[in-house]
A protein has these predicted regions:
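Extracytoplasmic "Venus flytrap"
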Residues: 29-55, 65-74, 164, 219-224, ...
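Hydrophobic alpha-helical segments within soluble ligand-binding/sensing domains
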Residues: 120-126, 131-156, 258-278
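An alpha-beta-alpha
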Residues: 48, 135-182, 284-300
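C-terminal motif of bacterial Sec signal peptides marking the signal peptidase cleavage site
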Residues: 18-21
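Flexible loop/hinge segments that line or gate small-molecule binding clefts
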Residues: 101, 105-140, 242-254
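Short beta-strand segments enriched in small/hydrophobic residues
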Residues: 26-41, 132, 155-162, 213
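Periplasmic-binding protein-like
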Residues: 31-33, 83-96, 114, 157-160, ...
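Hinge/cleft segment of the Venus flytrap/periplasmic-binding protein
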Residues: 273-318
Length: 318
C-alpha cells in the first residue's frame, strides 16, 4: 500500500511538472504585459509577435495572454503576479515598469522573463532568469536634428519626464552631457510626479523661455503627447522633437528614431529561443542604438521651420 501511495504521489508530481506553463486548454501560456498604448509600444508588441513567428513559434499552439497596464505600474505588478500564478511558460514585458514588475513577480518561480524596450538595462541586472532588448537613444544624433531644424545651437530645450520611470533621469543626464557639445545650449527639465499635472508642467517650461521640447523614451509622458502636450505647444508655435517615428507621425516636428518593430522582434526571438529550450543565460541582451531621421513636413510648415538640406531625412506626413 505504501508503494502504491508513493508511486501515485510521484505520478502527480510528474503531471504537475509537465503541466507547468499550461492553461485550462492544455496549451502553454505566453504572457505579454504592455505598459500602455502609444505608437512605439504598439510597434514593440507587433515586433514581438513577428519575432515569435519568424523564429518557429506557431502561436496557435499556445494561449497568448496579452494585458495592458494603461501606464500604471501598480496594475503591471498585479498583471505580472497573475501570470506567475498561471505558471506562464514565459512572460514578455514591454517597457521598464512592466519589466521590473514581471521580474519581481517571477523571482524564484522559475518562469523566464523577456523584457522589451528597457532603456536602462542596468535596472534588470540584479534579477535572474531574465533577458531582453534595450532601446538606447542617441542624443548626439537627436541634437543634430534639433539644431538643424532650429537653425542655431544656443537653445533652451524643455524636457518632461515621469518620476515613475527609472530610466528617465538617466536619459536626462545623457541629454545634458550631449548638449555640452553645443555652445549656449541649455536643458531645462521638469519632473512629472502626477501625470494629471503635465499641462501645468508644460506651461511652466514655456514660461521659462524654452525654444523647443525634446521627448525622452518616457512612456508616461509620450502617452500624453497628443492629448495634452502638443495642443499647448502648437498654440504657442513651439516645436516638439520626438524620440521615435510614431511621435513624428502624430505631430512632432522631427526625430532621430530607433525602429521599435525591430526592438520588439529581438524580444520575440529571445522568447522563441526560450520556448524552444534555451536558458535566459544563453541569450545575450540585444541593444538597438542606430537611429533613422524622420520629419513631418506639414508640422514643420505650420511651425515655420526650414527643413535642413545637410541631414538625411524621411518625411512621415501623409
Amino acid at each position: 500500500m505504501k508503494k502504491i501511495r508513493f508511486f501515485a504521489l510521484l505520478l502527480m508530481f510528474v503531471l504537475m511538472i509537465s503541466l507547468a506553463g499550461c492553461s485550462g486548454s492544455g496549451k502553454k501560456t505566453i504572457g505579454i504585459i504592455q505598459f500602455g498604448s502609444h505608437g512605439s509600444l504598439n510597434n514593440c508588441y507587433d515586433g514581438v509577435i513577428k519575432g515569435l513567428e519568424e523564429n518557429g513559434i506557431n502561436l496557435d499552439d499556445y494561449d497568448v495572454e496579452y494585458v495592458n497596464s494603461n501606464f500604471d505600474a501598480g496594475v503591471s505588478q498585479t498583471q505580472a503576479n497573475n501570470l506567475v500564478n498561471k505558471k506562464a511558460a514565459v512572460i514578455i514585458a514591454i517597457a521598464t515598469p512592466s519589466a521590473v514588475a514581471a521580474a519581481n513577480a517571477a523571482a524564484d518561480s522559475g518562469i523566464p522573463v523577456v523584457y522589451c524596450a528597457v532603456t536602462d538595462a542596468s535596472v534588470m541586472e540584479n534579477y535572474t532568469n531574465v533577458t531582453g532588448s534595450s532601446d538606447i537613444p542617441d542624443f548626439s544624433k537627436q541634437l543634430e536634428v534639433v539644431t538643424g531644424f532650429m537653425g542655431r545651437n544656443n537653445l533652451k530645450i524643455g524636457v518632461l519626464y515621469s518620476t515613475e520611470e527609472s530610466s528617465s533621469p538617466v536619459q536626462v543626464e545623457s541629454l545634458k552631457e550631449a548638449a555640452k557639445a553645443y555652445d549656449g545650449m541649455e536643458i531645462l527639465d521638469s519632473a512629472v510626479a502626477d501625470i494629471t499635472t503635465i499641462d501645468t508642467k508644460t506651461n511652466e517650461l514655456i514660461d521659462r523661455g524654452v525654444d523647443c521640447f525634446v521627448n525622452l523614451l518616457d512612456n508616461t509622458v509620450v502617452g500624453k503627447l497628443e492629448t495634452n502636450i502638443l495642443p499647448i505647444t502648437n498654440e504657442k508655435k513651439i516645436p516638439v522633437f520626438g524620440s521615435e517615428i510614431e511621435q513624428v507621425k502624430v505631430g512632432c516636428a522631427a526625430s532621430a528614431s530607433i525602429e521599435y518593430i525591430n526592438v520588439g522582434k529581438d524580444s520575440g526571438k529571445a522568447a522563441a529561443q526560450i520556448l524552444s529550450g534555451k536558458a535566459t543565460s544563453e541569450i545575450p541582451v540585444s541593444r538597438t542604438t542606430e537611429p533613422n531621421n524622420y520629419y513631418n513636413s506639414k508640422v514643420c510648415e505650420s511651425l515655420g521651420l526650414t527643413v535642413p538640406s545637410d541631414i538625411s531625412l524621411n518625411d512621415t506626413a501623409e
